[in-house]
Amino acid sequence: MTIRSLNLFIIDKKHQHKSSLSSFQNCKLGIDASFYLTQIIHSFTPQELQSLAVNGESEYLQHRISEFLEQLRTENITPIFVFNGIPLTFEASSQLEVPGKQKSHSALTDFEAFDPYDANIQRNMYRMDASGPANYGESKPTLLYTNQRDHLDRLCDQVKFYLDQCNVEYFVAPYLAMAQLAYFLNGTSSPYIDAIYGSTDLLLFGVKKFITSMNTSSNVKISSDPSSPSTQTTINSAAKSSFTWLDGNALLQDTNGLSWQQFIDSCLLCGTAISPTFPQIEGTFLIKSAMELVRMFGSAYRAVLHFAEIFPQPIFQDYLQQYKRAVCFSKFGIVMDTKGLTLPPVPTESVPNDINIYFGTRLPNEIYFYISRGLIPCKMIGALVSGCFSDPVSILEQHIGDKASQGTFSGANSGLNPGRDNAAAVAAVDQRRFVDDLEEIWSQGLNLLTQPLNRFYQARDIVSLHGHNQQASLKVMHSYDPPLYNDTRAWMIYEENLPSYLSSNFLKEEPVVLFDLLRALNDPVFVKKSFCTEGNIGIKNPPKHPLSSTAEIVLSSCYRFLQIRSFVLTSHQLTSWGCPLLKALENCHLQNQTSVVVLFELLRLRQLKEPSLLSSSSASIADLSITSATEFLAKVATFLPIKQRPEVSKISIVDENLLQFYQLQTSFGSNLKELMAMILASVILNRNVDKSKIDPKLIRKTLPFQNINGSLVSGFVVKRFFEIISKEQEASSQQENIQKAYEIIEKEFPTIGSAENHIAQFLEFWKTFMEGVKEAENTSAIGKLVLSKLFLTNQWIFSLGL
């Protein structure tokens, strides 16, 4: 994101400065990771963007990042990536619903507190509706316009994972990365970094010199303004290894007498990453119009106040809230200081008492520290801080929700198409079940997070906003009796009790092997030693022998995760679902093990539905719906990654149902990752760990679910393959059918290389899946009808000669 139209002002006044990257040698460069990632995405071709969307991992993204890092390494520049932290989703304070003049007077009185030139604003600057009664209205959840969008979350996680592999330092800000970068540069007597690479929004945080774009050895130049024509990739060999930077003081000199605060006011009116465009401003050159307004009225506050009676009340109130947040974030953006304390970067006496209205409830500094080190992701913590979160159902509403509305008829047309009506009803039920399953994960994670905290957090209501719809919200119940921690605290795994196959991964700094975790529970000696010998350990009664190594911390957390997700009993034995999972993981490739866990979770929760039968009177291959079986195999294939060659080619095949399922399983996997992190936080916060022995980087490298592989392209390939061979009946042999299918696949998907190799990998993956299913038959985890359909699908596959 960037300040709207400021790029035109910069070009018009010729304020872009270019320098050689070599002039920045031996320096530390702070990088706004979300901005940098957005720049890369805007430079991608449509084909590259499509590849990024349909693959769990992007080789193009990794290649671009590795090239950038290599160029910095060549110039001896140390990069420090700073990521956005807790999402600024929040529950607004009371909005008075009063009629007529009282409502208008209340709004204006409230807004007057935001005049930055008023001498009486100090402590009560952000008091909401001070003139009204406290209980006049009820609070309503509202979503903040934030620059950390949902679609960037998965990519940011990939970048963190890749930076760890490259041993590159990164930092997660408490809230906004821009505020933290500004503190790193200007907030201390000895700056932590020498320069910032970020968007023009940094001007709002007092940064007056910063880098806006860089040309590395690939000759790829990316503009800081996505809306400008220069956003497209350009080749510029003359500007090789250079960077473009901006001088805010020079900009100020061309504003015809505006003060710095008035210039920032103008930027806020234009529209930024933290504020929308003021509705009264029109045209292309927004910054000039905004400057004229500020010059005319003296401040943005007075300009907005002047038009209060012109705007319809809903528009004015909405913009009013957005403006307040923007002022709050730019002036009091909370950062982590050099002492590890999380505070606004201004003197305490100038901080408003009710700043929590916009930043949410404050957490212990210890939690912010673990966030900064990348140990704890921020979505669940954001829900606790704000009191609400965006319901994951919005992911599905783009697909099945729209279909459901299209399939529902009203009035005279109602019932004319019962097939579509039934499909819409089924889609709505499936959607609700998926949300319920995700909210169970959120309830578990929030219970684990709040248990060691103050009772205020334990009793805090968390509202799930149904697809950002405030009128269809649900309360997420996160109270368990007893707390989940009490049920799982018996897991205290000490290094002296570990089998060699469990400890070896930590020596190699690789993710723990989930199969090894489960098979260790078949050893009675290990099971006996896995129990904590001390009773009722916790924050008030820490163990005498706390966990002191990364292996002990990670393994204890993993076993608690498996118990909470019903794969392990409180007796530390495998459940009826744990045994099938163990069997499936036995011959599974290491990189696919977390995907198999997600696969069995969805199978257990009936989110992965078995193929259907044409007739229920018998159970034979002839009764199997080939179309349904093909769709089922394609869904299973989305858990399998696929390697593609560097060249890109547009994928013409679009399957909305498969796309919907891929989004469902990736969303579910990311929520399991959040739960895994909450369990880790519970272990640490309950003083089960010697905190001086925590190694954040090694924990990140060895904790599972950090990078769940999968690919939508893999599902497309497998579905197309089985569609072809099931229809090709005229060839002289099955092998000719198969070879013909391989040739067609390689023409339709030219970047995947050998279709035969990928189908072989899928069949191996399917084989491991079916081994788990067969074990589920022995443990009675899966019903007989579902088992029969899965076995028929397996028979059909091998009847094709594969």
UniProtKB/Swiss-Prot annotation:
<keyword id="KW-0810">Translation regulation</keyword>
<dbReference type="Pfam" id="PF12247">
    <property type="entry name" value="MKT1_N"/>
</dbReference>
<dbReference type="InterPro" id="IPR022040">
    <property type="entry name" value="MKT1_N"/>
</dbReference>
<dbReference type="InterPro" id="IPR006084">
    <property type="entry name" value="XPG/Rad2"/>
</dbReference>
<feature type="modified residue" description="Phosphoserine">
    <location>
        <position position="230"/>
    </location>
</feature>
<dbReference type="Pfam" id="PF12246">
    <property type="entry name" value="MKT1_C"/>
</dbReference>
<comment type="function">
    <text>Involved in post-transcriptional regulation of gene expression by 3'-UTR-mediated RNA regulation. Promotes interactions between mRNA and poly(A)-binding protein. Binds the 3' UTR of mRNAs, centromeric transcripts and antisense-rDNA. Required for the establishment but not the maintenance of heterochromatin at pericentromeres, and for the maintenance of small domains of facultative heterochromatin known as HOODs.</text>
</comment>
<dbReference type="InterPro" id="IPR022039">
    <property type="entry name" value="MKT1_C"/>
</dbReference>
<dbReference type="InterPro" id="IPR029060">
    <property type="entry name" value="PIN-like_dom_sf"/>
</dbReference>
<dbReference type="GO" id="GO:0005829">
    <property type="term" value="C:cytosol"/>
</dbReference>
<dbReference type="GO" id="GO:0006417">
    <property type="term" value="P:regulation of translation"/>
</dbReference>
<feature type="modified residue" description="Phosphoserine">
    <location>
        <position position="227"/>
    </location>
</feature>
<dbReference type="GO" id="GO:0003730">
    <property type="term" value="F:mRNA 3'-UTR binding"/>
</dbReference>
<keyword id="KW-0597">Phosphoprotein</keyword>
<dbReference type="InterPro" id="IPR006085">
    <property type="entry name" value="XPG_DNA_repair_N"/>
</dbReference>
<dbReference type="GO" id="GO:0005634">
    <property type="term" value="C:nucleus"/>
</dbReference>
<protein>
    <recommendedName>
        <fullName>Post-transcriptional regulator mkt1</fullName>
    </recommendedName>
</protein>
<dbReference type="GO" id="GO:0004518">
    <property type="term" value="F:nuclease activity"/>
</dbReference>
<dbReference type="Pfam" id="PF00752">
    <property type="entry name" value="XPG_N"/>
</dbReference>
<comment type="subunit">
    <text>Interacts with pab1 binding protein ath1.</text>
</comment>
<comment type="similarity">
    <text>Belongs to the XPG/RAD2 endonuclease family.</text>
</comment>
<dbReference type="GO" id="GO:0043488">
    <property type="term" value="P:regulation of mRNA stability"/>
</dbReference>
<feature type="modified residue" description="Phosphoserine">
    <location>
        <position position="228"/>
    </location>
</feature>
